[in-house]
Amino acid sequence: MPASMFSIDNILAARPRCKDSVLLPPSAPVVFPSLHGDSLYGAASDYGGFYSRAVAPGSALPAVGRSRLGYNNYYYGQLHVATSPVGPSCCGAVPPLGAQQCSCVPPAGYEGAGSVLMSPVPHQMLPYMNVGTLSRTELQLLNQLHCRRKRRHRTIFTDEQLEALENLFQETKYPDVGTREQLARKVHLREEKVEVWFKNRRAKWRRQKRSSSEESENAQKWNKASKTSPEKRQEDGKSDLDSDS
């Protein structure tokens, strides 16, 4: 056996590239989630920038299956292959690993050999957009929107609503459900919003009350310290003179 076969280049070249991405040949259709029986299709060539070539260009992918719901209520387009497995070379020759998967397999949305994890698209957006005609930049934008942290919607109250809420808060700190519903109809808000506002307002009121009590205690201590009798001051001065003599 020649010694060149044990060189570093040959050893590294023989190893399977586990970081290779799953491919889509140009002739294969891209299946997106079904919407009440209607499927959205797009050409695989539109997504050439997302997937590398791992099979021969002339090979076909038969038996296109259905998509499924991924994690966090996001749809993932899946391309299921019934014949030869398509995927990274390090995973094609091994049986399903169950809970222990190869590091090249995406943790979510990947259903074994032959599945293609497409760009995540929020399911509520799919009825209003033709996913098959999106460009690479638009798909990247969808990925960024998916990765962003979902921000909690914050209600902005008008001056009239705040005035009505404050007036009721001055009357009672804990209004019942009927009172909250009556106020909600008056200021055109939902009763849940009024309830949340009162919870936050009570928390703010307690903080203000606690801070004001601490300030009053500190003021009383300061007043007691400043109102020391002149006799006590003179006695302190005499004791200082005696100690010096």
Curated annotation (Swiss-Prot):
CDD domains hit by this protein: homeodomain
A biological process term (GO) from this entry: regulation of transcription by RNA polymerase II
SUPFAM superfamilies, alphabetized: Homeodomain-like
PROSITE patterns referenced in this protein's UniProt entry, alphabetically: HOMEOBOX_1, HOMEOBOX_2
Keywords annotated in UniProt: Developmental protein, DNA-binding, Homeobox, Nucleus
Compositionally biased region (Basic and acidic residues): 229-245
SMART domains cross-referenced by the UniProt entry: HOX (SM00389)
Compartment(s): Nucleus
Record-annotated disulphide pairs: none
Domain of life: Eukaryota
Biased composition range(s): Polar residues: 219-228
A molecular function (GO) term: DNA-binding transcription factor activity, RNA polymerase II-specific
One GO CC term, this protein: nucleus
Location of the region described as Disordered in the Swiss-Prot/TrEMBL record: 203-245
DNA-binding span(s): 150-209
Family note: Belongs to the paired homeobox family. Bicoid subfamily.
UniProt name for this protein: Homeobox protein goosecoid
